[in-house]
């Protein structure tokens, strides 16, 4: 299943923070995290100096790529029908490291929020969690910009956040205090579990789309897989040679990718722990001397919504696009001081954040998934690797369904 050669990513738009005179813009201005809401209606951006911007999506029409117009205009018209949302500025009081939108919760959750927070208009229950420098987590109502909850427990920077995709309002936080914590926002933000075992800072966390597994990665080269049902450790994944700083599950939960300062992305089978392939980030322009050995250190990795591509950001000033079946990138884009990346939920756009507080939006490959891939994705959404291997089907079909072949 070879993908057609895509065009190089094109820069669609760049957002820059305002520059109030009281801020020293030479420090604490990093965009450590960017996020789209699961329905694609909002974009959040930690622009440094304790500020998060909430921006209705899509942006102005001139920034919308070809093939994206119809869906975007429909979304915009629907939004206008119920009152146009406006850009919001959230002052979090501390440097913001992690961001996560909740999925749209079920109606019972909506009533719970309205009952316990009568000051919040009952118009939307989309919420945003922000992880702060002092270990606090702040929970915001997106439509109004109101602060709903403060979650306390971590003793150091909250580096990453992840909501269960099911809409249950279970939140996982990863911290430099070497722990992960599980919070139930349906119970006033009650802390229901602390996961320990990492020996160094926990950089990232990701919950599988089927809500069965949690991945966490830390500074001791380790990747941990946890059960989201029992909150116990399933296995450790060994293979990286330096700190692991980013992780993401494929849309069907069948694959896990991890990115490290060792310049490699490793693709794993999370059910078996098998290492399927490595994607090495070779510098296009080698350094002038051997002292700069970490110039290709990775910062972020993410899956595309259809599960056919990966995007990575590295210290060598490149955004790379990878096809799963290939070991070399299929496209590059130059970007300076990149820190994070994420795909738009409906595809076609990649957002990246930089050290100077900027956000850039790039075109992403838009391809029609093959029927084979769609069938594999549908099956793997509810079948584990072991269940696939137990099926009475030919070996080649098992290899395809378990991503050993493409």
Curated annotation (Swiss-Prot):
WD repeats lie at residues 107-150, 153-193, 197-236, 239-278, 293-332. CDD domains: SOCS_WSB_SWIP (cd03733), WD40 (cd00200). GO terms for biological process: intracellular signal transduction; protein polyubiquitination. Keywords: Repeat, Ubl conjugation pathway, WD repeat. PROSITE patterns: SOCS, WD_REPEATS_1, WD_REPEATS_2, WD_REPEATS_REGION. It comes from the Eukaryota. Transmembrane segments: none annotated. Pathway: Protein modification; protein ubiquitination. The SOCS box domain mediates the interaction with the Elongin BC complex, an adapter module in different E3 ubiquitin ligase complexes. This is WD repeat and SOCS box-containing protein 2. The lineage of its organism: Eukaryota, Metazoa, Chordata, Craniata, Vertebrata. The gene is WSB2.
């Amino acid at each position: 299943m070879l993908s057609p050669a895509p065009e190089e990513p094109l820069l669609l738009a760049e957002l820059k923070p305002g520059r109030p005179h009281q801020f020293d813009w030479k420090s604490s201005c990093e965009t450590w995290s960017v996020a789209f809401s699961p329905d694609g209606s909002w974009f959040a951006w930690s622009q440094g100096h304790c500020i998060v911007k909430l921006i209705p999506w899509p942006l102005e029409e001139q920034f919308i790529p070809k093939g994206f117009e119809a869906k975007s205009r429909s979304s915009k018209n629907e939004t206008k029908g119920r009152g146009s949302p406006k850009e919001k500025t959230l002052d979090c009081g501390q440097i913001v490291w992690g961001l996560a939108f909740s999925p749209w919760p079920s109606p019972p959750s909506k009533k719970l929020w309205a009952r316990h927070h009568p000051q919040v208009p009952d118009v939307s229950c989309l919420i945003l969690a922000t992880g702060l420098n002092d270990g606090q987590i702040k929970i915001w109502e997106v439509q109004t910009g109101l602060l709903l909850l403060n979650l306390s427990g971590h003793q150091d920077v909250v580096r990453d956040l992840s909501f269960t995709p099911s809409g249950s309002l279970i939140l996982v936080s990863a911290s430099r205090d070497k722990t992960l914590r599980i919070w139930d926002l349906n119970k006033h933000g009650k802390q229901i579990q602390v996961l320990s075992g990492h020996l160094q800072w926990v950089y990232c966390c990701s919950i599988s789309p089927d809500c069965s597994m949690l991945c966490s990665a830390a500074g001791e080269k380790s990747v941990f897989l946890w059960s989201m049902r029992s909150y116990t450790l399933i296995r450790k994944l060994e293979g990286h040679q330096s700190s692991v700083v980013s992780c993401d599950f494929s849309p069907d939960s069948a694959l896990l990718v991890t990115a490290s300062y060792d310049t490699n992305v490793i693709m794993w089978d999370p059910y078996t722990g098998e290492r399927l392939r490595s994607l090495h980030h070779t510098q296009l322009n080698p350094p002038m001397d051997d002292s700069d050995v970490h110039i290709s250190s990775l910062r972020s990795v993410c899956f595309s919504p259809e599960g056919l591509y990966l995007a990575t950001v590295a210290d060598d000033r490149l955004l790379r696009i990878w096809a799963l079946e290939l070991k070399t990138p299929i496209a590059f884009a130059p970007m300076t001081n990149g820190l994070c990346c994420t795909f738009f939920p409906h595809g076609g756009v990649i957002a990246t954040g930089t050290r100077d507080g900027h956000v850039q939006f790039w075109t992403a490959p838009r391809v029609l998934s093959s029927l084979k891939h769609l069938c594999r994705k549908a099956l793997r959404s509810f079948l584990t690797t072991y269940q696939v291997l137990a099926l009475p089907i030919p070996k080649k079909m098992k290899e395809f369904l378990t991503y050993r072949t493409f």
